[in-house]
């Protein structure tokens, strides 16, 4: 991956983080409206973390000479579907391949320590995120969907 390709991928990830954050805030509000307060709290926590990470991306991109307008343009091309079904939302958000992509991106920034460390921090956050999603999917399988939703109240 060339430096320019890595920078473009980094900018795309920033757009994804902002979009995911907005999607997760919306899903959190929906869960709260349905009475699934524990689930709402978890998605809100995730949304806040992703928003902070997106801000870190934006700040780093500006430091690297990118313009915020470029990130905004990238956000227009991203789709962030909203599910009103918690299981579908979790399944749609659960993307283990993201760890590999982030690891490859971190390696592309081997000569840019601040960016590499930032990406490595996200890798750990994504591992945690996927761990709770996997845990929730296992709860759904073991408890049954209705019992899971009741437990999330």
Task: Please name every model-derived segment.
Residues 1-153:
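Iron-associated oxidoreductase/ferritin-like identity signal
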